[in-house]
Amino acid sequence: DYIFHAAALKQVPSCEFFPMQAVQTNIIGTDNVLHAAIDAGVKRVVCLSTDKAAYPINAMGISKAMMEHVIFANARVAAERGGTTICCTRYGNVMCSRGSVIPLFIDQIKAGNPITITDPNMTRFLMNLDEAVDLVMFAFQHGNPGDLFIQKSDASTIGDLAKAVQQLFGDTGTNII
C-alpha cells in the first residue's frame, strides 16, 4: 500500500567517479519505482531527496535534482489518473548516518590521524535521525501529489563541526587540515 523510496547513490565522490551509476540509480531507478507503484495501485509514495538538489554543483546534486523532476512528472500523471499520491522530502545531512562526516571525523580522531576537510567554510545543514524520520512521516500523513517538503535545519561549517567533534572527544592535539 505504501512505499518510502530512499534508495540512492548519495555519496558525492561516488557520483563524481561513476556519474552513470548516479543516473541509473537516482534517476532511472526512481522512475522504475514510481512506474511500478502506479501500475500496482500503491496508495502513497514518499521519495527522499537532498538539499544538494537545490542549485546543484556536482553529479550527485544534479542526479537528485533530475530525480525530483521525475518524481513531480510521475506525481502529475498519477494524480490525473486518480491513483497513487507521490510526494517528496528534501533535507540536509542526517548526523551520524552512514557516509556522513561526523563518523569520519570520529574515526580519524580515534586513529590519531588529522581531521581532513576540503574547505573549512563549506556549510552543511544538519538534522538528527528523529528529525529526518519526523519529516518523512509528516510528508506521508499530509502529502498531496507533487508536494515537496523541506525541513529547515541548523547550519554549520565543516570547520566548526570538526572543532565540535574534537571537543566532544576532549581532543586538543589532533590537527584539522
Each language-model region and where it sits:
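Mid/C-terminal beta-alpha module of Rossmann-like enzyme folds, strongest
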Residues: H142-I177
